[in-house]
Structure formats: structure tokens, C-alpha cells
């Protein structure tokens, strides 16, 4: 942006800078007014409908992403998402690379030994996705060494292992879906909402869902570094406020067409119902 008048150039540059500062994306804009740093959030954006990239690849979307943004709004902070492999989420907290994780992570006692969890914002069970003409009609049909696709490091992988299934491990939930569609896998275990979403969209007319009644209820929760109890408590309050205002229910209705289920009020209560 060059002009023959130096004064005009400086003025134009100042206006441009001001415009960029005020008009950039809501998650990247400066937070000078509040003096609060952006909330750095690690996510593995491959898990439809919880966290995934928009069609143009420029933005993050999904139920959990919406909840994060609502929480950040309660805290008066902007959000900066960082896309990280699922098995790198906890290390990213431990190294202080990020402030919080938001990636369909179940609060478990094992993980709680490494990080802090906020109050849960979602409850679900596991489900199996299999082709419509598959002989699999119950979990019992998958035991005795049956091969199943799972995302490594997840409760689905632990469940399959406990049941004696032969595991085909993948880094991302989206890889499981691609493998099912390509015919390389005859079954995959996902969280039930993800399974239902796939069968209703990309897998429509070709796949079906088999419930896993003996899987325990899983509570999804945001994670924090062990030394960041202050942020954990702030997020706990924000989640409680979102429940009270009805915002969490609105977001749940938006993505799942059902009211938000009743959940434990604290992580400690949730951990009493998980392994």
C-alpha cells in the first residue's frame, strides 16, 4: 500500500491496522480491554460431531467446540485452538503448551492421576458401527478374537481389549470411519453419538449401530494441568452457570436433538462411576 504522500501512507497504515485488530476472528482478536490472555485449548479435531474442521478447513466446529466457546465467553476470554493428536493431549497440558484440553476425553481415574478434570459436560456410552449385512448383532458376536477398529488410547480401545477382541488401532476416529467405508474394517467402536451421527450421514443406508449395553457411562470433561486448579474451578463455575441459564441444553439440542442428560456436578462424583 504505497502512495506518493508519506503522511497519507502513515494514516492509511494506521487505519488498516485498526481495522485488522477490530475485524479479525473472534478467537484471535486481542483482549486488551479485559487484560486476559486467550484460552489455549488443545483438541483432536477429527471427532464428528464433537470437534472437527469446517468444510473449508478454516474453522473448528462441533458440540464440544461450541461448549468451549460458551465457557470462554463466561470467563471473558478469547479462544485459541491447537489441533493435536489424541495421545498428545495430556503431554500438551503437562508441558504447559496449552491451558485446557477439549477432545471427547472421558474422565477416568487413570487420567485423573495425571491431570485435573472439570465437571463433566457430556454423558454417553459406547456403540458398534457395522455394515447392514454384517452378522454382528450384539457384542457377544464380536468376542473370541473378532477384529474391531478403535482409536488408540480411548475407552473404546480399553473396552475391546478387555473383551478379548482383536484390535486394529487408529490415530483418529475419522480414520475408523474411512476404513469402514472402504471395507477394510467390518466393525468399529465409537462413542454412541459419533456412531449415530455417522450412520445418519455418511453411512446412511449402508451401516447400522449396535448398542453396547454393558459399557459404563462415560463422562466427557475438559482437562487441565495439575497445578492449574484455579482455571479448573473457573471452568467448573462457568459450566454450572451454562447449565443454569439453559445454554448447555440449547447446544445439546442443536447437535443431538435431545435434552442434555443429567450429569454429576463434579469430576470427583463422575470418577466414582468410571474406571
Model-derived features with residue positions:
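Short, low-complexity disordered leader/linker segments with a strong preference
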Residues: 1-38, 273-275
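Extended ligand-binding regions for polar small-molecule ligands
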Residues: 25, 65-74, 140, 154, ...
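Ligand-binding clefts/hinges and TM-proximal coupling segments of bilobed small-molecule sensing domains
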Residues: 26-32, 155-171, 207-209, 239-275
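Extracytoplasmic small-molecule ligand-binding "clamshell" domains
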Residues: 32-104
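Periplasmic-binding protein-like
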Residues: 45, 123-130, 192, 200-237, ...
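Acidic, polar ligand-binding/catalytic clefts
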Residues: 69, 78-141, 208, 214
Amino acid at each position: 500500500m504505497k502512495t506518493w504522500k508519506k503522511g497519507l501512507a502513515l494514516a492509511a497504515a494506521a487505519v488498516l491496522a485498526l481495522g485488522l485488530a477490530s475485524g479479525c476472528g473472534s478467537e484471535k482478536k486481542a483482549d486488551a480491554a479485559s487484560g486476559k490472555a486467550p484460552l489455549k485449548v488443545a483438541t483432536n479435531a477429527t471427532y464428528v460431531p464433537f470437534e472437527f474442521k469446517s468444510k473449508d478447513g478454516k474453522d473448528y466446529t462441533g458440540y464440544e467446540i461450541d461448549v468451549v466457546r460458551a465457557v470462554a465467553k463466561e470467563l471473558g476470554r478469547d479462544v485459541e485452538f491447537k489441533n493435536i493428536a489424541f495421545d498428545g493431549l495430556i503431554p500438551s497440558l503437562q508441558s504447559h503448551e496449552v491451558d485446557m484440553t477439549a477432545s471427547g476425553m472421558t474422565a477416568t481415574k487413570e487420567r485423573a492421576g495425571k491431570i485435573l478434570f472439570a465437571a463433566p459436560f457430556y454423558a454417553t456410552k459406547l456403540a458398534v458401527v457395522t455394515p447392514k449385512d454384517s452378522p454382528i448383532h450384539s457384542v457377544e458376536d464380536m468376542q473370541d478374537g473378532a477384529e474391531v477398529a478403535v482409536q488408540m488410547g480411548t475407552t473404546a480401545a480399553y473396552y475391546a481389549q478387555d473383551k478379548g477382541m482383536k484390535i486394529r488401532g487408529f490415530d483418529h476416529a475419522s480414520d475408523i470411519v474411512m476404513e469402514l467405508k472402504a471395507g477394510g474394517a467390518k466393525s468399529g467402536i465409537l462413542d454412541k453419538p459419533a456412531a449415530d451421527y455417522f450412520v445418519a450421514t455418511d453411512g446412511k443406508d449402508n451401516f447400522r449401530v449396535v448398542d453396547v449395553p454393558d459399557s459404563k457411562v462415560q463422562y466427557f470433561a475438559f482437562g487441565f494441568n495439575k497445578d492449574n486448579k484455579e482455571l479448573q474451578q473457573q471452568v467448573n463455575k462457568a459450566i454450572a452457570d451454562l447449565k443454569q441459564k439453559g445454554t448447555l441444553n440449547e447446544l445439546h439440542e442443536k447437535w443431538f436433538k435431545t435434552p442434555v442428560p443429567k450429569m454429576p456436578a463434579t469430576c470427583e462424583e463422575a470418577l466414582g462411576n468410571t474406571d
